[in-house]
């Protein structure tokens, strides 16, 4: 179980309060698929992902970005039991979808870049530290089934 300070919780809540899931979710997944093109293999049913423009304009990518970020947001309400919160998703991604667990980290790295771009200098280092800890806890929980 991850231990959270009151300050960390406040920072994470502050970041989530300013994230527009409908904007940041698609941007993070688009960035992930473009920067790490090997991640595209999990999205064969999404249609054309052959160019950056095709990825950015793909409504299935945008929709899944919203789904992924909505799922990531779930941890905010369950910070004291993140592993249990993601147990079912961990099984799904490992046993049915066979997703490389490192891809969770790649998506979260892309999300951090999107968030930093939106926040600019208001995303102070101590806020980013709390955010990274939060994302690491979620990535660990999602990859738990693989261990």
From Swiss-Prot:
Residues noted as binding heme b in the record, renumbered to the chain: 64, 93
Pfam families assigned: Globin
GO molecular function term, any single one: metal ion binding
GO biological process: hydrogen peroxide catabolic process
CC per GO annotation: blood microparticle; haptoglobin-hemoglobin complex; hemoglobin complex
Gene3D superfamilies on file: Globins
SUPFAM superfamilies, A to Z: Globin-like
Keywords: Heme, Iron, Metal-binding, Oxygen transport, Transport
Tissue spec. comment: Red blood cells.
Domain Globin: 3-147
Subunit structure comment from the entry: Hb 1 is a heterotetramer of two alpha-1 and two beta-1 chains. Hb 2 is a heterotetramer of two alpha-2 and two beta-1 chains.
Functional description taken from the UniProt entry: Involved in oxygen transport from gills to the various peripheral tissues.
Family: Belongs to the globin family.
Protein name: Hemoglobin subunit beta-1
Organism: Boreogadus saida
Lineage, uppermost ranks: Eukaryota, Metazoa, Chordata, Craniata, Vertebrata
